[in-house]
Curated annotation (Swiss-Prot):
Pfam family, one: ATP-grasp_5
Protein name per its UniProtKB record: Acetate--CoA ligase [ADP-forming]
One of the record's GO molecular function terms: ATP binding
Taxonomic source organism: Methanocaldococcus jannaschii (strain ATCC 43067 / DSM 2661 / JAL-1 / JCM 10045 / NBRC 100440) (Methanococcus jannaschii)
InterPro entries, alphabetized: AcCoA-synth-alpha, Acyl-CoA_Synth/Transferase, ATP_grasp_subdomain_1, CoA-bd, Ligase_CoA_dom, NAD(P)-bd_dom_sf, Succ_CoA_lig_flav_dom, Succinyl-CoA_synth-like
Length: 704
């Protein structure tokens, strides 16, 4: 964080570690860390003026007394002493520090935390923490934590804001035979952020999978770095606090719908991060990605000894965008020779309730060799003739003896409790995920498929880049008028501003009196009249819209009266009425949607699309993306909508102009990226015409 030329190797691969606050007293953190470092491949230097030695290792009064170079300092002294020892580390030339000590910003002690940040910056020391569990690197036997468990060596690197969550994962890992590479508890993140570590893991050969436990992000670089890393290595994240923080303060439709969690959801989706929603799912995903290959096709085979669960799994294929493979002819012939005559050879493949371990084994072997089957789900239910543990052993045997499973995931669902407990444990320990339900098995395969799609997704979009260039030029050429329009944002000025950037809006005028209203209505022919007031957000509720008025003068007066009555009813003091917007009436076959945007402190411009008009906050059929938005991602956003089929045309209804929506989403994202003074933007409704006919922004609201 202090500079862009830094390296984290002195923290992750130190050759020497000083433990400042090392202790001989059992139960103290300094004792636990000394004990955990006993097998470290490098040199250890205990620092504590009370002792001459600890565990038979010479103890020093200060890091300044150590003759050798020190790469990493682990600090476990009281919080008020931390600045002093960190200063000494700086003078000694220590490259990195892990500050275990608590009592900083997490308890409101920002002054003390700022002090250590200033010292670290002055001496160019990289800091992890404060208020953290510590760090591990299994590849050099580095356990600079006070955790009880040191996990097996492997390819999973984990970054966590919670020491407790980290401890729980480490405790579970041996049961699942999950191997770890780097383990980092980042605590308060005074210096090193998630993005710093993600950037480091990009080229770390020992890291194959990255796991995140996030409570909140501070660093705006996170999205960019995560997007780059996820192309090479899976990133799995669990985000706690899934509540819509700040929703009450939101002033627009977009603001009220774009709570904290939906923004994180959009960011993870755009960065290619695989999101876990529960701790259990996080552990399952770690096990899945550390044991199974990804698949480039969504065609899977399902084996079951119970027809009902096969049907449930097939239903889940629809839910998770997976397909049932068509077995090759040679596969069908082989299966006929293996299965009883009563077996129906189709997918899902019901191998009958009396299926033996040998039958399971032979069927799995056949489907392993079928090139149409890209992934395999094996379901077992405990029946009188079933031997779950023996079946589990046969599955492991097939997996280990068939090279096809290097590129073909093999997932199991042993449905039951007591009868299958041992078998599931055996499968997991031997690298086969075992789920309690078939639905979760299908979902697991879908994760492997979605990740493979994300890896090959093209991030560069020439159209997007052209829009960026065009909008920058427009902004420069229209500086003064844009500044004037943004000085008093209302529907009229918002639409004028959007039209400068080529976004389609109805022709309209702002009437200040009855005579102007009449004049403008005559100009436009069939028209719509709308009240313009910064205090009236929902015009329909206020009686602030009149369509095709017979008497524009009377309509003008009526809109003013309605606005005043609404203000009185809602307790609005000092009502400001800026006039009445008179616009052309759009007479086309159309569908209403909403497009909006919100400024987020971490992720920047968040763009929203959904079913529009008055129903947006009732149905909440919306999707979010982080700008800049590519055409592919804009299409993904639309496909997430439950109402997407309506856009495509159903039951005789015409197909709408989806390309117009995609184009508008891209442009609104770029518009928001340029105008950082805008906090929220609502385009509701946006009229979408029939295919290739475009659309038009019906209403616009800008909040600065």
């Amino acid at each position: 964080m202090w500079g862009r030329d830094y390296e984290l190797k002195y923290i992750s691969y130190p050759k020497s570690v000083a433990i400042i606050g090392a202790s001989k007293t059992e139960g103290k953190v300094g004792y636990a860390i000394m004990k955990n470092l006993k097998d470290f491949n490098g040199k250890i230097y205990p620092i504590n003026p009370k002792y001459d030695e600890i565990f038979g290792i010479k103890c020093y009064k200060s890091v300044l007394d150590v003759e050798d170079d020190i790469d990493l300092a682990v600090i476990v002294v009281p919080n008020i002493v931390v600045p002093k020892v960190l200063e000494e580390c700086g003078k000694k030339g220590v490259k990195g520090a892990v500050i275990i000590t608590a009592g900083f910003s997490e308890v409101g002690n920002y002054e003390l935390e700022n002090k250590i940040k200033e010292i670290a910056k002055r001496y160019n020391i990289r800091i992890i923490g404060p208020n953290c569990l510590g760090i591990m690197n299994t590849h050099i036997n580095l356990n600079a934590t006070f955790a009880k468990v040191f996990p097996p060596k492997g390819g999973v690197s984990i970054i966590s804001q919670s020491g407790a969550v980290l401890n729980a994962i480490l405790d579970i890992a041996p049961l699942l035979n999950i191997g770890f590479s780097k383990v980092v508890s980042i605590g308060n993140k005074a210096d090193i952020q998630e993005s710093d570590l993600l950037e480091y893991f990009l080229d770390d050969e020992d890291t194959k999978i990255v796991v995140l436990y996030i409570e909140g992000l501070k660093d705006k670089r996170f999205l960019k770095v995560a997007k780059k890393l996820s192309k090479k290595k899976p990133i799995i994240a669990l985000k706690s606090g899934r509540t819509e923080v700040g929703k009450k303060a939101a002033k627009s439709h977009t603001g009220s719908l774009a709570g904290e969690d939906v923004i994180y959801e959009a960011a993870f989706k755009e960065a290619g991060i695989i999101r876990a929603y529960t701790f259990e799912e996080l552990v399952d995903l770690i096990h899945l990605f550390s044991t199974q290959p990804t698949i480039s096709s969504n065609e899977i085979g399902i084996i079951t000894n119970a027809g009902g669960f096969g049907v449930l799994a097939a239903d889940s294929c629809v839910d998770y965008n997976m397909k049932l493979s068509n077995f090759e002819k040679s596969t069908i012939e082989k299966l006929k020779n293996i299965l009883p005559p009563t077996a129906n050879i189709s997918n899902p493949l019901d191998i009958i309730g009396d299926a033996t371990p040998e039958r399971y084994k032979k069927v799995i072997e056949v489907l392993a060799e079928d090139s149409n089957v890209k992934g395999l789900l094996v379901i077992l239910t405990p029946q009188e003739m079933t031997k779950p543990l023996e079946v589990a052993k046969s599955i492991i045997e097939v997996k280990n003896s068939h090279k096809e499973f290097k590129n073909k995931p093999l997932i199991t669902s042993f449905v039951g409790g007591v009868s299958v407990k041992g078998a599931k444990s055996y499968l997991r320990k031997n690298g086969i995920p075992a789920y309690i339900t078939p639905e979760n098995g299908v979902k697991a395969l879908s994760h492997l498929y979605k990740y493979s799609l994300m890896k090959v997704k093209e991030d560069y979009d020439e159209y997007l880049e052209n829009i960026k260039e065009e909008f920058i030029k427009i902004t420069e050429e229209n500086k003064e008028i844009i500044k004037e329009l943004l000085s008093n944002p209302n529907e009229y000025t918002a639409k004028k501003l959007l039209s400068i950037y080529g976004l389609p809006v109805p022709k309209g005028y702002l009437a200040k009196n009855e005579d102007e209203a009449l004049e403008y209505c005559k100009k436009l022919g069939k028209c719509v009249m709308k009240i313009v007031s910064p205090q009236i957000i929902h015009k329909t509720e206020a009686g602030g819209v009149i369509i095709n008025p017979k008497n524009p003068k009377e309509a003008f007066k009526k809109l003013i009266e309605n606005a005043k009555e609404y203000a009185k009813r809602m307790g609005i003091d000092n009502l400001i009425i800026e006039g009445v917007l008179v616009e052309e009436f759009i007479e086309k076959d159309m569908m209403e949607i909403i497009i909006g945007a919100k400024r987020d402190d971490i992720f920047g411009s968040v763009v929203m699309v959904g079913l529009g008009g008055v129903f947006v906050e009732v149905l909440k059929d919306v999707s979010f993306g982080i700008s800049p938005i590519t055409r592919d991602f804009a299409h993904e956003m639309l496909r997430e909508l439950k109402s997407y089929k309506v856009l495509e045309g159903v039951r005789g209804r015409p197909k709408r102009d989806i390309n117009f929506i995609v184009d508008t989403l891209i442009k609104i994202g770029v518009f928001m990226d340029i105008h950082k003074e805008i906090k929220e933007l609502d385009l509701n409704p946006v009229f979408v015409f029939n295919e290739k006919e475009g659309g038009c922004i019906g209403d616009a609201r800008i909040i600065k």
